[in-house]
Amino acid sequence: MESAVDRHVFYISDGTAITAEVLGHAVMSQFPVAISSVTLPFVENISRARAVKEQIDAIYQQTGIRPLVFYSIVIPEIRDIILQSEGFCQDIVQALVAPLQQELNLDPTPVAHRTHGLNPGNLIKYDARIAAIDYTLAHDDGISLRNLDQAQVILLGVSRCGKTPTSLYLAMQYGIRAANYPFIADDMDNLVLPASLKPLQHKMFGLTINPERLAAIREERRENSRYASLRQCRMEVTEVEALYRKNKIPCLNSTNYSVEEIATKIMDIMGLNRRMY
């Protein structure tokens, strides 16, 4: 197999480009290629399309290697301009639409911005997601213990183990009302579940992390502090993991997982319904 080489990748759309970016990234992750990527949303007029084409062509002229272009473009005139570029262009949506068209025996009715746009059909879901984000922000890091019974999941863990980004991802991606509660150094002498949380134990999910990784993360925040010392991190992780075992709280070591993977595993283990937006 050839060694990895740098490739320039463009994710282009006449909408948000989220679909092109996500699917294109998923495809590129299958190959041992180091990439330099550019995401270009809302390419929805001729002048912008021509500017994008020039950008693609400039990369080709500089490197002599065709840039990889993943696009999702409904407007034919815009699509044609991109296809005239020196890039290797792949329509990531059409690759799925064509066989589905045959299977369903229906013609698609493409509309720009449809995937992530607001319309009367998804407005209620959108409002629910915003409400979930508001709830999650209000219940981040133990800020408020009010209305915890409304949470769909309560994440527990030591400081800097990934509770906040995971909670926000659950809220933003799936509309999950996620609270999180931190265990701090002062708790460690007699670590127990707070009385206010005990009735909600069925909603709890614990995060843990390798002490070495935790120390490295904390060191970036508070250099040469007791808080970031490996000894302190080992002690906190040991105590918190013992608490999880004692109370039979499901948990996950977040060390080698991305936020997306952590959130997905929590959804699966806790039996939470996935609501895509």
Swiss-Prot record:
GO function term, MF aspect, one: ADP binding
Keywords: Kinase, Nucleotide-binding, Serine/threonine-protein kinase, Transferase
The enzyme's E.C. designation: 2.7.11.33, 2.7.4.28
InterPro entries: Kinase-pyrophosphorylase (IPR005177), PSRP (IPR026530)
Disulphide-bridged cysteine pairs: none
Binding site for ADP: 157-164
Chain segments annotated as coiled-coil in the UniProt record: none
Entry superkingdom: Bacteria
UniProt catalytic activity: [pyruvate, water dikinase] + ADP = [pyruvate, water dikinase]-phosphate + AMP + H(+); [pyruvate, water dikinase]-phosphate + phosphate + H(+) = [pyruvate, water dikinase] + diphosphate
NCBIfam families, per the entry: PRK05339.1 (NF003742)
Entry's family note: Belongs to the pyruvate, phosphate/water dikinase regulatory protein family. PSRP subfamily.
Function as written in the Swiss-Prot or TrEMBL entry: Bifunctional serine/threonine kinase and phosphorylase involved in the regulation of the phosphoenolpyruvate synthase (PEPS) by catalyzing its phosphorylation/dephosphorylation.
Protein name, UniProt field: Putative phosphoenolpyruvate synthase regulatory protein
Source organism (scientific name): Klebsiella pneumoniae (strain 342)
Organism lineage string: Bacteria, Pseudomonadati, Pseudomonadota, Gammaproteobacteria, Enterobacterales
